[in-house]
Amino acid sequence: MPARTAPARVPTLAVPAISLPDDVRRRLKDLERDSLTEKECVKEKLNLLHEFLQTEIKNQLCDLETKLRKEELSEEGYLAKVKSLLNKDLSLENGAHAYNREVNGRLENGNQARSEARRVGMADANSPPKPLSKPRTPRRSKSDGEAKPEPSPSPRITRKSTRQTTITSHFAKGPAKRKPQEESERAKSDESIKEEDKDQDEKRRRVTSRERVARPLPAEEPERAKSGTRTEKEEERDEKEEKRLRSQTKEPTPKQKLKEEPDREARAGVQADEDEDGDEKDEKKHRSQPKDLAAKRRPEEKEPEKVNPQISDEKDEDEKEEKRRKTTPKEPTEKKMARAKTVMNSKTHPPKCIQCGQYLDDPDLKYGQHPPDAVDEPQMLTNEKLSIFDANESGFESYEALPQHKLTCFSVYCKHGHLCPIDTGLIEKNIELFFSGSAKPIYDDDPSLEGGVNGKNLGPINEWWITGFDGGEKALIGFSTSFAEYILMDPSPEYAPIFGLMQEKIYISKIVVEFLQSNSDSTYEDLINKIETTVPPSGLNLNRFTEDSLLRHAQFVVEQVESYDEAGDSDEQPIFLTPCMRDLIKLAGVTLGQRRAQARRQTIRHSTREKDRGPTKATTTKLVYQIFDTFFAEQIEKDDREDKENAFKRRRCGVCEVCQQPECGKCKACKDMVKFGGSGRSKQACQERRCPNMAMKEADDDEEVDDNIPEMPSPKKMHQGKKKKQNKNRISWVGEAVKTDGKKSYYKKVCIDAETLEVGDCVSVIPDDSSKPLYLARVTALWEDSSNGQMFHAHWFCAGTDTVLGATSDPLELFLVDECEDMQLSYIHSKVKVIYKAPSENWAMEGGMDPESLLEGDDGKTYFYQLWYDQDYARFESPPKTQPTEDNKFKFCVSCARLAEMRQKEIPRVLEQLEDLDSRVLYYSATKNGILYRVGDGVYLPPEAFTFNIKLSSPVKRPRKEPVDEDLYPEHYRKYSDYIKGSNLDAPEPYRIGRIKEIFCPKKSNGRPNETDIKIRVNKFYRPENTHKSTPASYHADINLLYWSDEEAVVDFKAVQGRCTVEYGEDLPECVQVYSMGGPNRFYFLEAYNAKSKSFEDPPNHARSPGNKGKGKGKGKGKPKSQACEPSEPEIEIKLPKLRTLDVFSGCGGLSEGFHQAGISDTLWAIEMWDPAAQAFRLNNPGSTVFTEDCNILLKLVMAGETTNSRGQRLPQKGDVEMLCGGPPCQGFSGMNRFNSRTYSKFKNSLVVSFLSYCDYYRPRFFLLENVRNFVSFKRSMVLKLTLRCLVRMGYQCTFGVLQAGQYGVAQTRRRAIILAAAPGEKLPLFPEPLHVFAPRACQLSVVVDDKKFVSNITRLSSGPFRTITVRDTMSDLPEVRNGASALEISYNGEPQSWFQRQLRGAQYQPILRDHICKDMSALVAARMRHIPLAPGSDWRDLPNIEVRLSDGTMARKLRYTHHDRKNGRSSSGALRGVCSCVEAGKACDPAARQFNTLIPWCLPHTGNRHNHWAGLYGRLEWDGFFSTTVTNPEPMGKQGRVLHPEQHRVVSVRECARSQGFPDTYRLFGNILDKHRQVGNAVPPPLAKAIGLEIKLCMLAKARESASAKIKEEEAAKD
């Protein structure tokens, strides 16, 4: 049977005024004069006004009465609210004494305002009434599917509300002290009140009896229809009475009234009938069961006679009424405003059903229909069809359990007949729900009605339950009543949409749990991918699952996941802590720890639950295993029992239901408690009280790292600055002084406490603080002078605990540092032995063997060192090779020599004086930081070094905020911040570039040059954006194009940031493209720019000629601090062989692609388990061997001596791999912020450990580990420390840093942690200097480890050589495509527009654009994307709150604002801003408040207050901005946020994402669209990899030069 829906809602502009008879008005005035108490006055007013109040006001009064009875509201508060409601209606009545006229369905004067009751009554009002004298007979609904001859009555008309006549009953009994009563008791109270108010009821019956024709009567009560029929005399009497009253109040005539207000008559008639008949019906039926709602709503069998409207008869009266209305004096402004406010407030509280909580004006509100010939539950259950026994059997009595039956064609509804779901907590709140349907025997699997027994008003439902899955996709759901249990089959047609949602949520829960079982590292985007690619079962009548499906059912899904975790062991990592579940919980605002009654809801049972045993065992070398086994000796538990007992102590938030329940007394933790007779040793919380909120908090603490890292004070230096009183008796010199230098006499040896020390020995030094360990140093000089006494020069060692390694370091290992100090000999404690452990000659082939012990035994005075340590940059390098000369052996200090050399390089100096002028001296060259600058060189200068002689238009600023219609855009108020993620408004300018014309020093007053004040005069170069053409010119020009100008500027030499090459394009021996690709820091110009005339000219000859400099290639280079500042051209062309590379966890090959572009690598092997990514790697690297196996299995094969794998692929052997790179996944141990026995076990078996074992076995020349930025912060940086510790133990030089990919030429913010390592004998690469400027907020790259801040060697912190790359640079040339575009190959339809696009397109012979495809989003998501404005910074907060027809034909609803948001207040129009009760003080979330299928996603305003208003979700990219970190699945509500195209209504395509990563257009991807997105999102941006590769290349060149020079020296020595 078709479900009945409420009529569509018409926008309400005003509330119709009530009309009171004169006698009622007079009585109200008398009440004001009577000396009544407030309570008595309110009671009398209610008695007088009750029948005239609007339905909405009555509902609110009922709600107030309920709150009073439940003692949720005080009597004073109740009286105040009732007075407010009555005054509201009275104020409207006083403002308008006449009804709005309605003619042929339209209101006069264009007034379309209607109240709720007026709208709902339209269905009956439009059907003409039958003659009053004709008796009515009930009519049954047709079952043959024919169209009904008259519209069905409105649900609002038939809604039963027995409490409307009992509002005053509480006054006599003391409302504040009254206890809550059952529904039956309230009904009895209703009867007594009706008896007392017979006169009032009689009057109401007399006024409304003739209007009862508008109400269809129940089919079961034809007798009542007769008793209710009026005689003609009674009608005439009533008509006379009304005429008399109308003459006094100028009310319309009865005919006019009947014509204009049929809806009001219907409403009044229904109210009268309900009051009259309610008690009699209640006596016939059980108090807790609803009335026969279907019978009440059956239309009559006979179609009533049509009554033609008589409009002309009332024409004169209409004209008089119109004239009276025009002459009525206008209301004062204050009254108008008050009335408007009243109207507004009434709109903010839409009426709800007091039973099921559904909105009464919801167009989707439906009413239950009973099956034909339905009977009550006891009668139904006794039907012989449901008996499973023969007539002779009496087995029923032998069962204690309730009988079980199947139920088909069922509907569930509340007392008022509204169809409602069973899973929203109504049953848990003791709301009585009933159902109807056809019951069948338990063995009958046929869902049809055949063979069933139809029942109605079954229940109420005591509980509902899920029995799991029937071996397939369908969940078995059941009800329990007091009489039986029912297993549900097929719902009725009207209930199918509601029940379908329940089946959907159960099936989605099954998908999620099964997905998390095998994907513990998954992200939210991965989960959405799984949901969207799962085909729904046929029974759900769904085409696809969407993200909206998951968010709609998030609370239920999370509860099921929590229940799944409860079934696990106490030491298991809960799967609800996976990254995807944490994101879902935040986004949907899920309440954790809700423990609903176990009997009411059971969890999905997994009969074949796969127990999570953690990751598979990692294959490790003995060295790697030894390090972990040693460090975690106390935490590794060999016995599983001990491991569980030593799990970390659980903490609780104390707020959620889980924390507040008592201990169970049954679990392992409880049995150990003293109160339950245990020992109390484990001190663990009850397993039933495992707090999900605290677990979430701890997991989140480890997930995101705050960008605003505080400045930490550096640790105190190891040396001592104080003098110590000397004891001459214990210190004596041995031998004579070696040399006397001024007051100092140098010695070779000294005797301290009978122990002889000599220069070069190592000692322990006493600290001032006795709690600190002894300091260790090498004695590099011994002397005595008259002022300080007996002294020595200490070159300090650094203990491993004082490095970034911290507690993971070897306690016997020391590190050299560039720190030294003069100390008194009396500070020496004793002599110690420090051994230098040099790498063995066969170091590269020793990988995987048993590690040799670095020291035999520990006598407390023997240590060793291998490496030198840079305390600022956390770099471990080979010790310096500086050797002393013969004449300074007695006082040579390596630290002093290195520090002096560095200071010399840093100090600017002038060289080669040219000319001495009056006020200055000219020079040809100058040095700074080891770099030589000559006249004619190009130099980088900071942006503030000089300005240009043209006034540029001010940078684009956000337009001032225009006033917004807050009713249409209710979430716009959340955009109070001007900051937009992905905006380049605060990006710095790139370096100024000049050509040195003069190097000079001004003269001092004595005529000598002031060489500490070096200045340079430069010719300015304009960039395209610096000319009058401004920023647009830069998009089409090459990024290294400049314009010469004759403008000059004088700049301090100290401000110079580096050297660059600027050439005239026509003078180049090769084309501009070849020149530009030949090395870094290369620029060219073709024209000169005249700022005065704003014109471009040919450059002058002196600009074209580089002067005496030639091209200045490679002259005068010293060793710089940053190798990136050097020109890349070597002095002698050296052919470098490419490194044989193994790429582990290669993905589609972004890292290898960057190394190939740098020209340093030949990737011969790659390991990638995920097949689509492995196939993509093969497509782009056809010469590589790609293994699609577990890396642990491959390493085990190699270590076992195998040369091929099971597929016959040749395995790389020891000595084959020269470079090892990869990005091991590390989310598996990121769930908790600190290590414990289980998380350590996960880490020990993680892929990071496997990767380190690869490094130890193969011992490559260079090693690179790439990972997410948080890799350096996981487990309080323990993962970082252990990784570096392994590399140091192997003998590698190593360092770590964080790089921003956006600074190396992509339009994307992507911070990545990089660990670099170089074998002994190689040079450890520096991190590449940034090439492009980028948003400062995204460039916080420092790392805090153990309260010490570490930075990398990067010096370009505030600017860079090139401008930032933008979204426009990236993809403005790509053709327009629509949502869901799927053509794999299309044409470009145009030339590249920017330098970046030219680089990525390359030189294709027949250009084809591949993978310009985008995800097909659901109809609702597509509608949201269409309504996101195109302005920069637009996101979900700019969505209008409107109804929209979706592409699938359905309608998206408006979002309802139903609660007062205490944080955000109300809108400017006074509208509410809250969508759930949790925004009100001290209230929890209301499951019934959830809204779905709305244009504004309900979950975002629900949780926005605690998540930065979800800024960026459904956000558009900005043409002049950049991408957020490209993820594996672009979702408008995912982490990446801004994934909408700047101008098109779709998410970004695969090719656009690939370009945001810097992949060339020729780079091939493999698989379906989601596979390709994942390949791109997981990759390392090739430009970043290229920049690192070029640094490695510099190190290889430096070593090659050293080898070449050493060879030349050997040859020269051999000749001699």
UniProtKB/Swiss-Prot annotation:
Residue ranges occupied by any SAM-dependent MTase C5-type domain in the UniProt entry: 1139-1599
Region spans: Interaction with DMAP1: 1-120
Consequence the record notes for mutating residue 659 to G: Reduces activity about 10-fold
E.C. no: 2.1.1.37
Region (Interaction with DNMT3B): 149-217
Entry keyword Nucleotidyltransferase: no
Catalytic reaction list: a 2'-deoxycytidine in DNA + S-adenosyl-L-methionine = a 5-methyl-2'-deoxycytidine in DNA + S-adenosyl-L-homocysteine + H(+)
Region (6 X 2 AA tandem repeats of K-G): 1109-1120
Region ranges (Interaction with the PRC2/EED-EZH2 complex): 1-336, 308-606, 1121-1616
Annotated stretches, region: Homodimerization: 310-502
The protein, known as: DNA (cytosine-5)-methyltransferase 1
Organism: Homo sapiens (Human)
Name of the gene: DNMT1
